[in-house]
From Swiss-Prot:
SUPFAM superfamilies: Thiamin diphosphate-binding fold (THDP-binding) (SSF52518), TK C-terminal domain-like (SSF52922)
Single Gene Ontology MF annotation: pyruvate dehydrogenase (acetyl-transferring) activity
Cellular localisation: Plastid, Chloroplast
SMART domains: Transket_pyr (SM00861)
Its biological purpose: The pyruvate dehydrogenase complex catalyzes the overall conversion of pyruvate to acetyl-CoA and CO(2). It contains multiple copies of three enzymatic components: pyruvate dehydrogenase (E1), dihydrolipoamide acetyltransferase (E2) and lipoamide dehydrogenase (E3).
Quaternary structure and interacting proteins, as annotated: Heterodimer of an alpha and a beta chain.
Gene from which the chain derives: pdhB
Residues that hold K(+) according to the record: 113, 162, 166
Catalyses which reaction(s): N(6)-[(R)-lipoyl]-L-lysyl-[protein] + pyruvate + H(+) = N(6)-[(R)-S(8)-acetyldihydrolipoyl]-L-lysyl-[protein] + CO2
Official protein name in the record: Pyruvate dehydrogenase E1 component subunit beta
Annotated InterPro entries: THDP-binding (IPR029061), Transketo_C/PFOR_II (IPR009014), Transketolase-like_Pyr-bd (IPR005475), Transketolase_C (IPR033248)
Bridged cysteine pairs (disulfide): none
Organism of provenance: Staurastrum punctulatum
Enzyme class: oxidoreductase
Length: 328
């Protein structure tokens, strides 16, 4: 067992897969000799060489397309976006090629590509560097979306993503890279389709992912002190969602709170709420509540930025409201 920061866990997982499979390669801006914008690939260029660590121009559409072509030939490329917001420039390649080529080629091609990088609301990074792209990509057929939230699941998810035959987008939150946790020494994988029960409980099901997992855990300290017993589930797989784990929890608690950093309109929470209403309506004792970021560009101002994102106090208030209303 050894303590690692989240970015170090990603590095170790990626390195293990590159050692295991010579078909795995990495491409992106500054991933080579600079070691990546957050040092996930530090030291890789010296170990694996320039053919497996490809420094690219600032041309996201081009190098993402190049990676998709490499995947079609049997390689397993890992594309790092210096910031996830810049992957909007590669949306055509990701949507029309990565997501759909397996189908449109009559299953003649598989696209085992991983697209990963930092995103989410940081600390005064401005609107363009504070994007949450999960809502953009969730409607693209053929893509699998996962979000890491701890060093342990970050390492396991990147390994499983690389081994998948499907195109996977791995969302990493910029404020979680320095999160520290003890990592098992033995090799392990994290299932791409399985949610994690972070805390069992009986009063309410709280569904969350990425950075908001930690906001929920912070709020839970106050909730437990006040006598509430929330069940916390990190959904991990944003698409497809693990409806089995979610169903079991809701049939026990009968109340649901969704907490996300994604935008309210068209976000992961909106899709999740629709799925729950379709499949589990009869088990609900109260309306589903969804706490999401405001539908505004993220301000540069620190105090204004904080107001756009859900805070622990709002989670406490929402749980109190749902539990009290549901018990009336």
């Amino acid at each position: 067992m050894s303590e690692m920061l989240l970015f170090e866990a990603l590095r170790e997982g990626l390195q293990e897969e590159m050692d295991r499979d010579p078909k795995v390669l990495v491409m992106g801006e500054d991933v080579g000799h600079y070691g990546g914008s957050y040092k996930v690939t530090k030291g890789f260029a010296e170990k694996y060489g320039d053919l497996r660590l490809l420094d690219t121009p600032i041309a996201e559409n081009s190098f993402t397309g190049m990676a998709i072509g490499a995947a079609m030939t049997g390689l397993r490329p890992v594309v790092e976006g210096m910031n996830m917001g810049f992957l909007l420039l590669a949306f055509n390649q990701i949507a029309n090629n990565a997501g759909m080529l397996h189908y449109t080629s009559g299953a003649n091609f598989t696209i085992p590509i991983v697209i990963r990088g930092p995103g989410g609301v940081g600390r005064q990074l401005g609107a363009e560097h504070s994007q949450r792209l999960e809502s953009y990509f969730q409607s693209v057929p053929g893509l699998q979306l996962v979000a890491c939230s701890t060093p342990i699941n970050a390492k396991g998810l990147i390994k499983s993503s690389i081994r998948s035959e499907n195109p996977v987008i791995l969302f990493e939150h910029v404020l979680l890279y320095n999160l520290k946790e003890t990592i098992p020494d033995n090799e392990y994988l994290v299932c791409l389709e399985k949610a994690e029960i972070v805390r069992p409980g009986t009063d309410i099901t709280i569904l969350t992912y990425s950075r908001m997992r930690h906001h929920v855990l912070q709020a839970t300290k106050s909730l437990v002190y006040k006598g509430y017993d929330p069940e916390i589930i990190d959904i991990v797989s944003l698409k497809p969602v693990d409806l089995g784990t979610i169903s079991t929890s809701i049939k026990k608690t009968h109340k649901v709170l969704i907490v996300e950093e994604c935008m309210r309109t068209g976000g992961i929470g909106a899709s999740l709420r629709a799925t729950i209403m379709e499949h589990l309506f009869d088990f609900l004792d109260a309306p589903i509540m969804c706490l999401s970021s405001q539908d505004v560009p993220t301000p540069y101002s620190g105090p204004l930025e904080e107001l756009t994102v859900i805070q622990p106090a709002q989670i406490v208030q929402a749980v109190e409201q749902l539990c009290n209303n549901g018990n009336n």
